[in-house]
């Protein structure tokens, strides 16, 4: 093309310079000035990496003074272009604008503009962009978003609760599963779903101080949710950046004590516009009508301001109906406003639970029971269903199930309360206790005697706590370097036990970090036993490494030595041998220790080894736990209640372990109390609530559906392709593991979701569960989600040129591959993507205006193509520019029909689904007071908004590829 002074060109290799103007010419060279940056570039006349900028009728262009022109005609005179059209700010028509007056900062965002301006991308990036569009659209359509990507086993009852609650608008529920059934994971799944769906953006978690790090670790490792921990120092720092420090972060964890201590802090928290509040250990919020505790009032104030509330408690309601009412009152103060009314309602509810038990038993129903069912369900056409349920016909079972569903919908607190018990959830191992009685060394006897004399002024509780750990008393007098492990018989016993069980993984838990560290040294030096240590002084990454070292089968540690606090929130189901080097102070901590191994997914019976020194507090406590509470071999829901009522007596026995008078009677009394409460619990078992919480077959089907989506081959192929193109280094390790590290030539300098020092990933859920240091990559993982955003929100792969070697077609045959996207813009919380995700429509146009996409599948077509360098690509584009314009116009008329059909289908689906949901909720509200008005209103508003936004859906060209046939 001949050059003329004043022509506008763009650099193919430095598009950031903007539009250049030809300012000097000679026989061999041309000079371009780039006014946007003030830089000059010298190019050879032949084969320079620059492209002529030419616009076409229908384009909108910008003048250097800031106004825009809709081009209607293009004139060329002496090699210079003049654009004629309508000025958009004044609507003046017939305005002429010479190309020299074009805005130099012009950027090309439309794929066709980038193609014609020579900003052509690589062919593999075009393919990645199309796949990203296709897979993203498919993922949006799949149900269970937010449940698939968690790094946890697919346990039906957990998935059922999370799915039920996570789908609701501003859920307000009480999660009351028994210990070891995974309430934290359920809460995490609900949070994850609410965040992914856009129903929540700001989440506050309030927990006891000792559980802060456990929650932080669980949210990060299982759900890739990075919470900020707010304590006094973090609060003071944030105060410098904002008048309300809590507005500086979206996801926050803090302790109940941190909130309780300061009135201003509480007000700031309440004003910080959270969407979801999660409170763990909610049974510690003491309440009575006359005097609610300060802790209760704090949570009550927050719950009034925050739309969604999840309360977590392991205490069954039968162990304190008043405190159970208090927790429900936090969730819905209008519904649960009077305690006496609540008690009366619960008594009415008893026959409902009995009726369900009867229906499930399969026995014939007496007339009085049939009448009761008729009254409880209160439907006009219930008679045929009752007859069918009581007959021997084939549909009797189905009729009974329908009646149970009707009862579930109408009665009790099943909308706000979920509780699973170990009786209702199968798959737990047995626990076997082995107590090993060892002599008390004279060194300890002396230290305890001296301590008794010198600590006479200590409180009974302080003395009791001291007496549990004789090695600490000894060190107190002999100094920190006192080598207690040389004479403590528990150490000798532990060494022998580990040597005898060389091939077993053993978890050893002790109360203090110092004990764990000293034991590790002894094991290493005396028997060369490989041990990992796990304590609160380690960072999360160091703990991950220690846990991975313990988990590794080949060259891993035989033993993991844990301190009490260090082990919180970590589970090691692959081990089944637990050694308690000492005992914890209360039954909750004991259950927490055993719970490290006693989880769903544990394949073996658990052997609990308790070496203890005779005539010490450990011996007393061991007896009380085992004989009084049966807490070693079975979970003990009654433990906290009995501990609280017998606390004074218990610490008296622990503080003076040699004075045993009355101990047998005390233990016997506790056992009676335990048995009595257990019977009460079993009688009060709420079958209806358990069925609702467990999810039954529906929950099984949900777990299977998600399991079927695991190991998606499309994900593995796409992820590896994405890592290659983004420029992430991949180092394959054994066991399906890949180490990802940033490289120096990435598409973006700091890839979101990829740590600076890299990370280990796997696509296998089981592998991720057994390796603490491996992240589980799914379509929901931040690396994949951020990768999709990176590709699709920018221009990566939006235009390309390829050659097709095919002797069956004439040389020079031109094909244009187009990817249109049909989408609707709307606030995230409306979840329009359920009905109309950004959906690609692929077209393959020939010069005759025929769309060949249906006959030519993308992947097989892509494999036949060859890449072209950028310079040759620009030349090809310039040669066929007019043809491509004509083919684009033909495609525009064809795509409209497909796009409108997609939009209509989405509108129909949304209307059907949301109207059905609304009708069901309204029908239930008429018979169940637990459905809040705001839930119905939110669903009605949501339906209207979804349909309005779908009506405004449109389509646009997202990517274009020019394909030219060659025979070489």
UniProtKB/Swiss-Prot annotation:
Residues annotated as signal peptide: none
Where is the motif DEAH box annotated in this sequence?
Answer: 280-283
* Residue span, Helicase ATP-binding domain: 164-334
All copies of domain Helicase C-terminal, residue ranges: 490-664
Q: How does it assemble?
A: Interacts with the RNAP. Has a higher affinity for the core RNAP than for the holoenzyme. Its ATPase activity is stimulated by binding to RNAP.
Summary of the function given for this chain in its UniProt record: Transcription regulator that activates transcription by stimulating RNA polymerase (RNAP) recycling in case of stress conditions such as supercoiled DNA or high salt concentrations. Probably acts by releasing the RNAP, when it is trapped or immobilized on tightly supercoiled DNA. Does not activate transcription on linear DNA. Probably not involved in DNA repair.
* Similarity annotation: Belongs to the SNF2/RAD54 helicase family. RapA subfamily.
> HAMAP family from the xrefs?
Helicase_RapA (MF_01821)
Q: What is this protein called?
A: RNA polymerase-associated protein RapA
> Which organism was this protein described from?
Serratia proteamaculans (strain 568)
Q: What gene is behind this protein?
A: rapA
């Amino acid at each position: 093309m001949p050059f003329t002074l004043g022509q506008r060109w763009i650099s193919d290799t430095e598009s950031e310079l903007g539009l250049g103007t030809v300012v000097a010419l000679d026989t061999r060279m041309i000079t371009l000035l780039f006014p946007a940056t003030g830089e000059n570039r010298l190019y050879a006349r032949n084969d320079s990496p620059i492209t002529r900028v030419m616009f076409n009728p229908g384009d909108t262009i910008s003048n250097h003074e800031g106004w825009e022109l809709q081009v209607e005609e293009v004139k060329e005179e002496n090699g210079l272009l003049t654009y004629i059209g309508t000025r958009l700010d004044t609507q003046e028509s017939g305005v002429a604008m010479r190309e020299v007056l074009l805005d130099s900062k012009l950027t090309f965002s439309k794929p066709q503009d980038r193609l014609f301006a020579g900003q052509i991308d690589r062919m593999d990036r075009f393919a990645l962009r199309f796949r990203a569009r296709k897979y993203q659209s498919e993922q949006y359509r799949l149900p269970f978003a937010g449940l698939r990507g968690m790094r946890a086993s697919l346990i039906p009852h957990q998935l059922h609760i999370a799915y039920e609650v996570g789908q609701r608008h501003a859920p307000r529920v009480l999660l009351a599963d028994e210990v070891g059934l995974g309430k934290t994971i359920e809460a995490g799944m609900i949070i994850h779903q609410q965040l992914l769906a856009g129903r929540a953006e700001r989440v506050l978690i309030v927990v006891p101080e000792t559980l802060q790090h456990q929650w932080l670790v669980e949210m990060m490792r299982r759900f890739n949710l990075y919470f900020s921990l707010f304590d006094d120092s973090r609060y003071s720092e944030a105060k410098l950046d904002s008048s309300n420090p809590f507005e500086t972060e979206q996801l926050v964890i803090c302790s109940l004590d941190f909130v309780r201590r300061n009135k201003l802090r509480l007000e700031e928290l309440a004003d910080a516009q959270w969407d979801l509040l999660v409170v763990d250990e909610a049974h510690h919020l003491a309440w009575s009508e006359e005097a609610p505790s300060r802790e209760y009032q704090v949570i009550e104030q927050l719950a009034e301001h925050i739309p969604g509330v999840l309360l977590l408690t392991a205490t069954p309601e039968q162990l304190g109906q008043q405190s159970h009412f208090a927790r429900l009152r936090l969730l819905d103060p209008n519904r649960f406003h009077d305690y006496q009314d609540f008690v009366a309602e619960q008594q009415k509810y008893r026959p409902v639970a009995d009726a369900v038990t009867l229906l499930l038993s399969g026995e014939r129903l007496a007339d009085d029971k049939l009448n009761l069912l008729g009254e409880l369900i209160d439907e006009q056409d219930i008679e045929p269903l009752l007859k069918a349920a009581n007959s021997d016909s084939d549909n009797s079972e189905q009729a009974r199930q329908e009646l149970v569903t009707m009862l579930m919908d109408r009665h009790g607190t099943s909308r706000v309360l979920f509780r699973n018990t170990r009786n209702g959830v199968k798959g737990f191992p047995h626990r076997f206790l082995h107590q090993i009685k060892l002599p008390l060394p004279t060194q300890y006897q002396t230290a305890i005697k001296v301590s008794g004399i010198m600590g006479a002024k200590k409180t009974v509780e302080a003395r009791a706590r001291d007496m549990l750990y004789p090695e600490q008393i000894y060190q107190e007098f002999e100094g920190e370097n006192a080598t207690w492990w040389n004479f403590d018989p528990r150490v000798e016993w532990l060494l022998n036990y580990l040597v005898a069980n060389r091939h077993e993984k053993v978890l050893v838990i002790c109360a203090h970090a110092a004990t764990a560290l000293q034991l590790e040294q002894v094991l290493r030096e005396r028997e060369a036993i490989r041990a990992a240590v796990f304590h609160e002084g380690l960072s999360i990454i160091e703990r991950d490494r220690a846990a991975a070292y313990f988990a590794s089968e080949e060259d891993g540690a035989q033993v993991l030595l844990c301190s009490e606090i260090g082990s919180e929130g970590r589970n090691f189901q692959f081990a089944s041998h637990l050694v308690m080097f000492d005992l914890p102070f209360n039954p909750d901590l004991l259950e927490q220790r055993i719970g490290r191994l006693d989880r769903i997914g544990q394949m073996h019976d658990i052997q609990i080894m308790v070496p203890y020194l005779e005539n010490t507090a450990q011996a007393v406590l061991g007896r009380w736990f085992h004989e009084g509470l049966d807490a070693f071999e079975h979970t003990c829901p009654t433990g906290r209640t009995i501990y609280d009522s017998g606390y004074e007596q218990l610490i008296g026995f622990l503080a003076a372990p040699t004075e045993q008078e009355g101990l047998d009677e005390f233990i016997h009394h506790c056992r009676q109390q335990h048995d009595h409460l257990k019977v009460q619990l079993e009688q009060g078992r709420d079958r209806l609530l358990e069925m609702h919480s467990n999810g039954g077959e529906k929950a099984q089907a949900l777990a299977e559906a998600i399991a079927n989506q695991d190991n998606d081959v499309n994900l593995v192929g796409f992820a590896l392709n994405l890592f290659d193109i983004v420029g992430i280094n991949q180092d394959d390790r054994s066991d399906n593991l890949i180490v990802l590290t940033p490289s120096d030539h990435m598409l973006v300098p700091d890839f979101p979701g990829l740590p600076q020092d890299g990370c280990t990933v796997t696509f296998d859920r089981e592998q991720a569960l057994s390796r603490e240091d491996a992240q589980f990559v799914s379509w929901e993982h931040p690396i994949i989600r951020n990768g999709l955003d990176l590709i699709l929100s920018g221009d990566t792969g939006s235009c390309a040129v390829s050659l097709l070697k095919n002797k069956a077609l004439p040389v020079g045959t031109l094909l244009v591959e187009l990817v249109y996207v049909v989408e609707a813009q709307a606030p995230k919380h409306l979840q329009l993507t359920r009905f109309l995700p950004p959906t690609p429509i692929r077209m393959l146009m020939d010069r005759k205006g025929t769309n060949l996409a249906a006959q030519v599948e993308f992947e097989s077509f892509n494999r036949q193509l060859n890449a072209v360098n950028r310079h040759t690509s620009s030349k090809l584009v310039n040669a066929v520019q007019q043809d491509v314009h004509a083919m684009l116009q033909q495609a525009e008329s064809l795509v409209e029909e497909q796009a409108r059909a997609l939009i209509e289908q989405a509108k129909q689906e949304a209307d059907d689904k949301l109207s059905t949901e609304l009708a069901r909720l309204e029908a239930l509200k008429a018979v169940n007071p637990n459905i809040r008005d705001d839930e119905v209103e939110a669903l009605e508003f949501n339906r209207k908004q979804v349909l309005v936004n779908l009506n405004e859906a449109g389509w646009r060209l997202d990517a274009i590829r020019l394909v030219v046939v060659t025979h070489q």
